[in-house]
Each structure stands twice: as C-alpha cells, then as structure tokens.
C-alpha cells in the first residue's frame, strides 16, 4: 500500500512541475504584456474625460423635440449640442453653453448634417437662438424654415442664389434707408442720422474690402481705395436721402457713380463735383467724398473707377431680384428677435459666391454695432452654421470674424471635410487662425488615406503605457518591462470609428468620446418642404442723377446765397464756375423765392 501512495505523490509532483513550467512559459510571452496606462505621466498624461468631468463641463438637457414643438419644457440653456447620453431610457443632449466657436471635421458621408447639424438647429429653435446657415443643396431651409416659423415663432429669411425668383430679398442699404427715413421725419433725431451714416460706412467698407484685403495692403494705391470707400459712402447717403422708395438699392449706387463720370459743361469740373457743390457745406456726404473732391481730375477719375470696379460684380439681372427690393435680413431684428436665415449657394455657379461673403461680412459688422450699443455683448446668442464651408471659395474676413465675435455672444460653427480645405481657401496662416480660435473641435469618420486623422491623432496627445520584451534562454526565460508613449487614439483608430461616434476636444478639458445619433433617433421629424412663392421677374427702378439733383435743389437751394459775380468773371480770377441752371431749375428757384 505504501509504494502505491508514493507513486501517487510522485505523479502529482511531476504534473505540478509540468504545469508550473507551462504557466511560467505562458507568462513569459509577448501576449502577456498589455498596453495599459502605467507610471506617473512620464511620457504623456492624455486621457479621456470621466463621466464626472463630462457632467461638470456640459449641461445635460432632456432632448424632447415633440414637446418643444408644443411649447412645453423648452430649454433655457443656449449653446451647441456636442454629444448625447441615455439615462433611464431618456435621451439627454450634452450642451456647451460657453462663448465658443466649434470646428466640425468629417469626411463626406460621415453624417455632419444628419447627426450633428439637424439636432443643433432643432435645439437652437427650442432655446430661442437666432441662427444663420449656409447650404449648397437647399435641404436645410426646405426641412427647417417651416418648422422654425410654425412651431417656434421664428422670422425666417431664405436667400436662394440658385433660384433668385424664389428667394427673399436682401437690400444692402436697408438699415441706411431705415434710419435716414427716421431722420428726415424728425431732423432733431441725431441718433438716427448717426446710425444711417454708420451703416453707410459699414456697407462701403464691406464692398471695397471684398477683395479680401484692406486699404493698408495696397501700398501706394491705398489712397485710391480709401477715397473710393468715401465716395461709396457719400453715394449711398445721397441715394438714401434723395431717392424715392423702390430706387434706394446698391445698383442705384452704381448707376449714380457711372452717371457722374460723364463730362460736364463746366471746364475743369466733373458731374460729381458739381452735384456735391449743390449740397450745404456741412452735409456729411460732401465730407465723406472730400478726399476725392480735393484731388486732381485724373486722380478723381481713378477713385471713381475704383469704386465702380468693386460694384461691377452686382450687375446681374437675376441678382437684382434679390438686391433691389425689400429685405428679409435685418441685423437688428436678427440680434433682438428669434430669426433664422438660410443662405443657399449654387455649387454649379461660383460667380455668385461673393454675395454670400458680402452678406456675412455686412451682417457680422452690423451685429458688432448692435453688441457695442448693448454694452459689448448681445442679450440673445447668435450662431452661424457654415455647412460645407470648405467646398466654397474663401469667405472674406473670416479670420477677423473668428477672432472678435466670440466675446459678443456670436458663435461660428464651420463644417469641413479636411484641414486641406481650410489651407487651400485661407492659406496656412489663415487656417491656423481659424483653428486656434475654435474652442471646441468635434471630429470622426475619416477617409482611409486622410491626413487630417494624423493631425487630430497628434492633437489628442500621448499617454504613458507599459511595454516590454521577452528573452528566453535554455533554462531561464526572462521578461523586461518599460514605459513608453502611445497616442491616445491612433490615426487608424480614428479612421475606424463607427458612424455616429465622435471625439470632442474642448479647451481646458480632457477630450470626450460621444455618440450623435441619427436625427430620427433624436425624435426629429420633418413636414412638407418649405417653399417660397414664385415671384415673376419684377421691373427694377434705378436712381436718376437729374432727379437727385432737382431734389437737392428743392431742399437746399433756398438756403444758398446768390453768387456776386458771373461764372465768366469768376473763371477769370480762378474761382469755381457754376453749373448753368436748366429751365426746370429756374422755375423751381422762382417758386422757392416766391414761397419765401
């Protein structure tokens, strides 16, 4: 019996040794070395945000569009929807309520519109933010203009450059005309007069700067652009003050300047000088044009030609249907009341893209004026959703918009497919300015060969992980462990993110992994597509130089003193020659004298 027990013990010992050797050999394999976070950040401290940190950074708002459209449980936190989470079977939106710009990056087909933009527009409507969207296909206004107006009480405006006869209007002189009318009704209202002059200067500067640079970039030619800006300001004020309704638009400004370039009957004076000479010496239009009026004749012709060259782009019979009638875009209304503006850009006709750039520049500058009058900040947040901004030509002064608008409670959300699009349109420095001014970046879903994934992988940073090596001798295998750095997410991992999964980076916080569901799963539904009534080609009325001149004489000639000498005598002593009065003007002057 004892030998049997000894054999059993020996067998158990033998199998134990074999098992131990097997376990030891398994331990000393490369598969046993796991890439887990170790150390104290010796090679990088990058990590994803915890649930607690996410809750502290973002406001969690129950996402209930069905109730919102009935006017129930409307959210009060204004901001951008950057993620979602489910809790107790209920969907919550993660909202960044800070004053931020947000850069959205994703390849074509990743779901930028269906997963990100639609939930954001619905939320913007629910919390009452005014917003503007750019769109190349027209889907945004067809799906949301009607909902915003019907359920949320928004004023909506659609500027459709693809179908100008099915578009709302955008008269660039609207605010100038508005405040000029207030001043003409009450000449003691100096505030209205000042605002008319301010918006005239903004419009002129926007047009002259439409080439993407300001006058300081033109070197020796800077005078001509500065003077052309003054001439445009003066012409805009003349149109607003002396033309009847229906003729006060930007095309009339072009026609007036062109008419004033015609030769006059007075030697050494052109029509522009003679027209402004009929204004009182204290009239601001005369002052704005002073640089051009007090220069040599050839230089003045160059100034007027510079102004005309900037206005040439507006000469389009289709665009006139948008530019020459009532406006649907009002910066003051946009800032103070719930307003949605949809800009439709035709991909097949890039000659009209400059209008989008001008609308954005002018609206931005006018928003700054409203903000400054309100203590430097808007009461109601405003958001610009620039969808497909990478596929259209450069939006002039975009870098300036990103740099200065955030503190005014104006958020911009550019949506691009790759960094290469920004570099192409805005150059390396311009792209860096835009990227650096975006406090939030949301990205996911990249093409297999995307270089943007490499850039974003690097921007996420590195973490410290365990690595090691195995060496095996004849009898004694050994293992060596080290700490190395590893990207928080490699480019390959970013490229393989499932659709609807995104990474959100925010200034001052750790990045967040989140999901943005398809708009249908957010509870968003669309109704009948929004349509604008077809407007037949309307006849455009233009300003007339003779009409403006007669109106100036009617208002101001009674205040002018009679010249003491004849034009010929004044010419001999070097004085300014006077314009011969037409029969109509003589009758008008006689009437005015009789009335006196």
Question: PLM ranges: what are they?
Answer:
Residues 1-110, 114-122, 127, 165, ...:
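Basic- and hydrophobic-enriched, low-structure N-terminal and domain-boundary segments
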Residues 42, 324-329, 473-480:
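A glycine-rich phosphate-binding loop feature that marks nucleotide/adenosyl-phosphate handling sites
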Residues 43, 47, 482, 582-585:
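General helical secondary-structure elements
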Residues 51, 55, 467, 476, ...:
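General helical structural elements
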Residues 81-89, 93-410, 425-428, 492-513, ...:
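P-loop NTPase motor domains
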Residues 402-503:
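Conserved ATP-driven motor cores of ASCE-family P-loop NTPases powering translocation/secretion/packaging/pilus
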């Amino acid at each position: 019996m004892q030998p049997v027990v000894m054999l059993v013990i020996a067998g158990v010992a033998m199998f134990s040794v074999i098992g131990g050797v097997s376990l030891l050999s398994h331990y000393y394999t490369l598969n046993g070395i796991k890439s887990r976070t170790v150390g104290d950040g010796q090679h990088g401290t990058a990590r994803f945000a915890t649930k607690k940190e996410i809750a502290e950074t973002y406001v969690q708002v129950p996402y209930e569009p069905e109730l919102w459209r009935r006017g129930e449980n409307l959210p009060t936190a204004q901001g951008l929807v950057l993620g979602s989470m489910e809790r107790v079977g209920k969907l919550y939106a993660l909202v960044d309520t800070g004053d931020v710009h947000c850069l959205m990056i994703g390849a074509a087909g990743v779901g930028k519109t269906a997963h990100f933009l639609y939930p954001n527009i619905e939320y913007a409507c629910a919390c009452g933010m005014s917003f503007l969207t750019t769109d190349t296909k027209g889907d945004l206004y067809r799906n949301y203009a009607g909902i915003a107006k019907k359920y949320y009480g928004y004023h909506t405006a659609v500027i459709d450059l693809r179908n100008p006869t099915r578009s709302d209007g955008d008269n660039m002189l609207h605010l100038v005309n508005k405040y000029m009318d207030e001043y003409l009704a009450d000449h003691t209202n100096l505030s209205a007069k000042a605002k008319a002059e301010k918006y005239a200067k903004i419009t002129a500067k926007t047009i002259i700067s439409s080439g993407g640079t300001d006058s300081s970039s033109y070197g020796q030619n800077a005078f001509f652009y500065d003077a052309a800006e003054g001439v445009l300001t003066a012409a805009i004020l003349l149109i607003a003050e002396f033309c009847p309704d229906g003729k006060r638009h930007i095309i009339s400004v072009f026609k007036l300047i062109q008419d004033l370039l015609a030769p006059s009957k007075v030697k050494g004076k052109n029509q522009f000088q003679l027209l402004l000479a009929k204004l009182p010496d204290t009239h601001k239009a005369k002052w704005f044009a002073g640089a051009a009026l007090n220069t040599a004749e050839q230089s003045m012709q160059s100034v007027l030609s510079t102004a005309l060259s900037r206005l040439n782009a507006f000469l389009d019979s289709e665009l006139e249907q948008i530019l020459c009638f009532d406006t649907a875009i009002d910066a003051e209304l946009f800032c103070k009341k719930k307003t949605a503006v949809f800009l439709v850009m035709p991909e097949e006709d890039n000659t009209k893209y400059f209008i989008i750039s001008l609308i954005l520049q002018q609206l931005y500058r006018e928003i700054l004026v409203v903000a400054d009058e309100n203590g430097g900040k808007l009461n109601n947040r405003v958001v610009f959703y620039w969808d497909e901004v990478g596929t259209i030509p450069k939006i002039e002064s975009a870098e300036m918009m990103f740099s200065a608008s955030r503190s005014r409670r104006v958020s911009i959300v550019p949506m691009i497919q790759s960094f290469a699009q920004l570099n192409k349109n805005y150059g390396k420095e311009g792209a860096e300015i835009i990227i650096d001014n975006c406090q939030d970046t949301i990205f996911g879903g990249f093409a297999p060969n995307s270089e943007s994934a490499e850039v974003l992988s690097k921007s996420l940073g590195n973490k410290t992980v365990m690595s090691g090596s195995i060496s095996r001798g004849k009898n004694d295998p050994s293992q060596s462990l080290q700490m190395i750095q590893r990207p928080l997410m490699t480019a390959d991992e970013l490229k393989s993110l499932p659709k609807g999964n995104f990474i959100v980076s925010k200034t001052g916080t750790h990045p967040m992994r989140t999901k943005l569901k398809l708009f249908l799963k957010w509870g968003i539904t669309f109704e009948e597509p929004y349509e604008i009534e077809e407007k037949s080609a309307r006849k455009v009325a233009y300003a007339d130089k003779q009409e403006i001149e007669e109106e100036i004489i009617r208002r101001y000639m009674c205040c002018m003193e009679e010249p003491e000498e004849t034009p010929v005598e004044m010419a001999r002593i070097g004085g300014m020659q006077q314009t011969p009065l037409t029969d109509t003007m003589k009758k008008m002057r006689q009437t005015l004298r009789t009335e006196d």
